[in-house]
Amino acid sequence: MSAEQKYFENAQNVHFTLADGSKIPGLGLGTWRSEPNQTKNAVKTALQYGYRHIDAAAIYGNEDEVGDGIKESGVPRKDIWVTSKLWCNAHAPEAVPKALEKTLKDLKLDYLDEYLIHWPVSFKTGEDKFPKDKDGNLIYEKNPIEETWKAMEKLLETGKVRHIGLSNFNDTNLERILKVAKVKPAVHQMELHPFLPQTEFVEKHKKLGIHVTAYSPFGNQNTIYESKIPKLIEHETIQKIAKSKGEGVTGATIAVSWAITRGTSVIPKSVNEQRIKSNFKYIPLTKEDMDEINSIGIRARFNQATFSNEPVFAGLEDGRT
């Protein structure tokens, strides 16, 4: 067996066990900012190649294409872990089940494996994804996240959602949920990469039995993230370790492997067939590798949530680029 085949099989086989015993694939496909008319083929390609986790969200505006890609892949639904997220315009408790129904309709699915509150930010309830007043200012609405969470818990009773969780919550907002939760969040999705490891926060989740999924694992590779610092996957430390592992190992491989080695699942995004396939590799990194990566001194959070009316990342490891 070649080294590349071994890395591929590692990626296929790696799973993490959630608190209820369910197993979430360690490596999935993100669909944020996947271009129109390309998302379907990206999802189809990923699933046919070996991915078994597809990460979607209402705000991405492409759940219909995600659903088409799942259907056309030929991979049985029971073998795929599908995640979606509740957008900020549906935090009112009565809006939560309606938002789920819209997502399921678009995805052409009967249930989700995982449904997350996308952000602890509440906009005016309605169809408009970013509701604004006549002056162009975003319109916010008071919907306590505790009440939104209770509405999420009720979704579990319908069988249309199997796990519920959070995305982009800081410690304060996480604690607010934990105080009222009858069902503890199964998963918390957050920006994580070697420039933003958030080690203490990740460790807290492990102790709580809440699985963590890393998004934007390549950091500032996405063109939406303007940055004055070098590309993460081109950093000399990342490249040095990649070269030491042999042919076919890239900076992206190391970034993905770093995430998985530290116990988090990871959802790199691409619509490029070659990159979708090349991203699907996992090399268990040594302690020396991990220590070297963790010693990188750069700290940068690229998703700054400029639409929020609150400092949603207050108290967390941060970085301004």
Swiss-Prot record:
Catalytic site: Y60
UniProt key word Hydrolase: no
EC number: 1.-.-.-
One Pfam entry name: Aldo_ket_red
Gene Ontology biological-process annotations: arabinose catabolic process; cellular detoxification; D-xylose catabolic process
GO molecular function, one term: aldose reductase (NADPH) activity
Signal sequence, renumbered to the chain: none
Transmembrane segments: none
Keywords tagged on the record: Oxidoreductase
Residues annotated for substrate binding in this entry: H118
Site (Lowers pKa of active site Tyr): K85
One cellular component term from this protein's GO annotations in UniProt: cytosol
Top class in the EC scheme: oxidoreductase
Family to which the UniProt record says this protein belongs: Belongs to the aldo/keto reductase family.
PANTHER family assigned to the protein according to its UniProt record, in alphabetical order: ALDO/KETO REDUCTASE (PTHR11732)
UniProt-recorded name of the protein: Uncharacterized oxidoreductase C26F1.07
